[in-house]
Each structure stands twice: as C-alpha cells, then as structure tokens.
A protein has these predicted regions:
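Short acidic/polar hinge/loop motifs at secondary-structure boundaries
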Residues: 43-45, 61-88, 109
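Extracytoplasmic beta-strand/coil segments of soluble accessory domains associated
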Residues: 21-62, 82
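N-terminal periplasmic "start-of-domain" segments of outer-membrane beta-barrel proteins
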Residues: 1-13, 43, 51
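Non-catalytic regulatory/gating segments with a bias toward low-complexity or hydrophobic composition
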Residues: 24, 84-85, 104-106
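Membrane-embedded beta-strand positions in outer-membrane beta-barrel channels/transporters
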Residues: 43, 83, 103, 133-137, ...
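Periplasmic-side early beta-strands and strand-to-turn transitions of outer-membrane beta-barrels
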Residues: 113, 119-121, 136-196
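Membrane-spanning beta-strands of outer-membrane beta-barrel proteins
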Residues: 39, 99, 129-133, 174-176
Length: 196
C-alpha cells in the first residue's frame, strides 16, 4: 500500500497559483527551487532528492521526460488540472524508473458539463518586475453525453528579476503560451475513445 496525498483545484485557487511549479510548494515533502539563473528552470525535490529522481505523470501516463519535467513545471497551468496526486518515496516498480524520490500524477479536467471560465492575474515582485497571467477554459458536452471536449489556454509574461542588482537575474525572463485539449467519444455505452 502507498500513501497518496491529493491537491485539488481549491488549493490552487486559495494560494492564487497560476502553474504547477508554484502549487507544489504547498505539499509536505516537496520543494520547488530555481536551479539556473540564466535559463530559469525550476525542479521539484521530493524527500530531498533532485528532480531526475522524481517521476511526473499526466493522467497516470509517463509522458513527461526528465528534461521536460524540469522545464515543464512552469508550463502546466493549474486551469487544466483537476487534482494532483503525490506519492512520496520509492515506487519505480509501479510508476517508472525515475520514481526514486516519489511520483507526481497530474489529473487533467474531464469534460463533464458545458462551462467557460476566464481568469487574469497581475503580480509584482518587490516593486521591480511585473508578471502577467491570463487563462481560459471551456468544455462542451453533447446532450446525450456521447462526446465532449475540454480546451484550456494560458499566457504568462515576466521580465527578468535581479533582486540584488549584481547583473544576474534570480528569475529569468518568461514568455509562455500554452494550449491543450482533452476530448472523448463514446460509440457505445461500454466503450470510450479519448484524445489528450
């Protein structure tokens, strides 16, 4: 048996998080740190072990490599996430070779009903640098529930941040646009074809 800690959308909203990297700091045993001032990549440490020892899954599939697990943490907007399941401790036999420190499983939103949401955030760091975020979600489902689609989009922009004025930025420049979808089709009551 393994212990699974779950982070849901209410947590993301209460801490005003815009991406997965900002959200993971609110889970015990996890720490997200910036390891390169030039390229600005964050990595997650589970139980103190570095990023390559953490397995990141999307919908229980290992689609994130060790490299994109480093750069991808800021590219996963919280507006596409239903919940995040965190398993601390070794689990290579269950989750994949990188799951030495632990596993982070990102469960994306499934189209359940017709909805639309737009959000925007603007934040400032020490009166020097502004960061803009804009996100949108939409989901459409047929009346008979045979097909549905969920779309998400996010945009983030941040200039480099030099906290101590030494000419090296502690946070690198960030200009990112993310788009994705999750869709399904049910030809019969007991079958489902999905695309993510």
């Amino acid at each position: 048996p393994v212990v699974v800690n779950v982070m849901n959308a209410k947590l993301f909203e209460s801490v005003n998080s815009t991406d997965l990297a900002k959200s993971l700091n609110y889970q015990s045993g996890l720490r997200v740190e910036n390891n390169c001032q030039n390229c600005g990549f964050p990595q997650v440490r589970i139980n103190g072990l570095e990023g390559p020892y953490s397995q990141i899954l999307i919908n229980s599939r290992p689609v994130v490599s060790a490299l994109s697990g480093v750069y991808g943490l800021e590219q996963i907007p919280v507006n596409m996430i239903e919940r995040v399941e965190v398993v601390r401790g070794g689990g290579s036999a269950l989750f994949g070779a990188n799951a030495v420190g632990g596993t982070i499983n990102i469960i994306t939103k499934d189209p359940i009903n017709n909805s639309f949401q737009v959000s925007s955030t603007m934040s400032n760091m020490n009166g020097k640098v502004w960061e803009q975020y804009m996100g949108a979600n939409a989901s459409l489902v047929s009346k008979d529930n045979t097909y549905g689609i969920a779309l998400y989009q996010s945009y983030r922009n941040r200039n480099p941040y030099d906290a101590d004025g030494d000419g090296f930025s502690e946070l690198g420049k960030l200009n990112m646009n993310t788009f994705g979808l999750r869709t399904y089709y049910r030809p019969t009551q007991f079958s489902r074809i999905s695309l993510e």
